[in-house]
Amino acid sequence: KKVKFMFLWCEYSHKMLLKCYNSHSFISTLARGRARIMVDYGINFWSNNDFIIADGKVKVNHKHKPALIDIVQEARERGYKGPLLLRFPHLIKNQVDKVFKAFEGAIKEYSYKGKFKAVFPLKVNQMPNFVLSLVEQSKDKCYGLEAGSKSELILAMAYTNENAPITVNGFKDKEMISLGFSAANMGHDITLTIEGLNELETIIEVAKELGEPYPNIGLRIRLHSTGMGIWAKSGGINSKFGLTSTELLEAINMLEKEQLLHKFT
């Protein structure tokens, strides 16, 4: 029975393999007088034409189009061993350009009077070889960094391009808020986004101690409406993040009273 089962399984696997070979997931080529069948790794679904298959190799579709296997072999010849993580700075620029092109098109289409600014959240990737490439590739764009901790804020202050925004989210104690005032004093376009009225009270306290220049002040609000998908439960009136409508009005009154309303953004 075991032999019969294995035979049936092998026959089934063989049929499935032939089916795959005849599908669009494989490319057939003739080389050295015999047929070769090469898997295309689903490249049409994920590469966005940034990677291509040519001469039987996966290649980077940029400039002289180096093959990934050639890059790995060269790394091995230099004495490096796996695993290797390859980064392609030109892809960063492509993605940044796509984002700005989309928003610039929408701004023009709907005659929007404002400007589009963007920030990259450092919590996603703080690796120097990525952050430095991102900053370098977005010099001509108003593309800054978002910080959620003191260490990330120091990193943003050190590497954000001139006139690019810095956004501070997450928990902020007095020390971090003071650091935000220091960033404003250095000339950074920085916004402290408050999560609760207690943070706004601390900002007002630090403003009285340090004086101008002040950072911009943002308010995270708690919307009544909810979205869809896996984050649906984290939104709406029951969300633990942001100010309620009542707290929003109170925050505006506090800013107006302390003559800081002009920094509200």
Protein language model regions, located:
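Polybasic, lysine-rich low-complexity intrinsically disordered segments
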Residues: K1-K2, M16-K19
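Active-site-proximal beta-alpha core segment in soluble small-molecule metabolic enzymes
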Residues: F116-T265
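Low-complexity, highly charged intrinsically disordered N-terminal segments
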Residues: A54-H64, I69-Q126
